[in-house]
């Protein structure tokens, strides 16, 4: 006397076999390995921006030249990785929660609001910092989007006008690149 109908028993056995097969095929994947991404800017403003997961934050390493010396430049992740019309086709700041613009330490901000990068006397920005809002997987994933460098300083949403709450009054887009998976993820 069987406790389960034959058809149900067969389906249960098949389900268990599928689970075992899936477990064997994914056992070589290292899901705990941090994801890394890179954006390569080309043109008058050129260089690299690297993104690496570190615990609950993402480390952002900037190495960009061609900037105005001794000046802060707005620095944002924009929605689209589409650069068919230069930096203008990257759309608005990445803002999946529909919030107002702010600085990287603001409680209310776009996910893509990374504040400013500071150029040295030679027009170069080379340093690292961390952000806790951008991610390299999930809803706040920035891979496939664009990193954009602006001509002016981002006022971090404190400019007192509507444009400040939208863009930080950061001005013209002077450099951009699509953020893609870095080779460290694969080889």
Curated annotation (Swiss-Prot):
Disulphide bond pairs: 87-176
Binding site for Zn(2+): 93, 101, 110, 113
InterPro entries to which the protein is assigned, alphabetical: SOD-like_Cu/Zn_dom_sf, SOD_Cu/Zn_/chaperone, SOD_Cu/Zn_BS, SOD_Cu_Zn_dom
Cofactor annotation: Cu cation; Zn(2+)
Catalytic activity: 2 superoxide + 2 H(+) = H2O2 + O2
Annotated signal peptide: 1-21
CDD domains: Cu-Zn_Superoxide_Dismutase (cd00305)
Keywords recorded for this protein, A-Z: Antioxidant, Copper, Disulfide bond, Metal-binding, Oxidoreductase, Signal, Zinc
MF (Gene Ontology): copper ion binding; superoxide dismutase activity
Residues where Cu cation binds: 76, 78, 93, 150
Entry keyword annotation includes Signal: yes
Function description: Destroys radicals which are normally produced within the cells and which are toxic to biological systems.
Entry similarity comment: Belongs to the Cu-Zn superoxide dismutase family.
Record-given protein name: Superoxide dismutase [Cu-Zn]
Organism: Paramecium bursaria Chlorella virus 1
Lineage, broadest ranks: Viruses, Varidnaviria, Bamfordvirae, Nucleocytoviricota, Megaviricetes
